[in-house]
Design a protein with these regions (language model features):
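Catalytic donor/gating beta->alpha subdomain of glycosyltransferases that bind UDP-sugars
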Residues: 1, 28, 33-96
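Long helical/loop segments within the catalytic core of UDP-sugar-dependent glycosyltransferases
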Residues: 1-34, 78, 85, 160-171, ...
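A short, acidic, flexible beta-alpha connecting loop/helix-capping segment that sits on the rim
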Residues: 64, 190-191
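Short, surface-exposed, low-complexity cationic segments
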Residues: 197-204
């Protein structure tokens, strides 16, 4: 879904890993080699530099990313998400802050709705709040069911909803952990990172 949204809003479109392509002329004119030599990440570092230089990044509609990540363990997914959020924090702080708003919108309403239902069962929450929470969760389930087609394969609704709950919880946990982060761990190496993603120090 995020990839589709990037295609609709060019201010959020950025180079994306293995799907990225750049001409040799642009590589040399914008000194990409020098940037990458001192940076903690390749694609996201360009997202923080190219817009300031008036360079537009276009998302290729045909570049639908395929991955074999379905078999990955949950800790592998968490480590991947850690890096993605941290890359934004270091390279594009404005998008990282906006991501925090998106995280709150994604995680807090479902959590409050579930707590309201639990409050109704224990007699703590009012009937009105329980009704609103129930209607919200029904609407969320309907919307999520409609979006199942984005996954590229048919998934049972219960599994899709469970995936959303796990993703939202992990997303919130990961984002909170980045608030005070000053670096990241990658393949056993700790990178202390400064403004713009520039590596200040490394240690094994």
């Amino acid at each position: 879904l995020m990839r589709y949204l990037q295609g609709l809003a060019r201010q959020f479109t950025q180079p994306w890993g293995g799907a990225m392509c750049i001409s040799r002329q642009a590589f040399e004119v914008h000194q990409v080699g020098e940037l990458w030599a001192a940076n903690v990440v390749d694609d996201c570092s360009l997202a923080g530099v190219l817009p300031a230089r008036g360079v537009r990044v276009k998302l290729c509609p045909g570049a639908l990313l395929r991955t074999e990540a379905a078999a990955h363990r949950l800790d592998v997914w968490r480590a991947w998400m850690d890096r993605q959020v941290l890359f934004l924090k270091f390279c594009v702080p404005s998008q990282w802050r906006l991501l925090g708003v998106f995280c709150a919108v994604m995680a807090l309403p479902p959590l409050m709705a579930v707590l309201s239902l639990l409050g109704g069962l224990t007699g703590v929450a009012s009937t009105g709040s329980v009704a609103v929470a129930f209607l919200y969760l029904i609407g969320l389930a309907a919307a999520m069911g409609h979006w199942r087609g984005l996954a590229g394969s048919a998934q049972p609704l219960w599994r899709w909803l469970l995936s959303f709950a796990l993703s939202a919880g992990m997303f919130a946990w990961v984002y909170v952990r980045t608030l005070r982060a000053q670096g990241l761990l990658w393949h056993g190496i700790w990178y202390e990172v400064g403004e713009g993603g520039r590596v200040r120090a490394m240690r094994r």
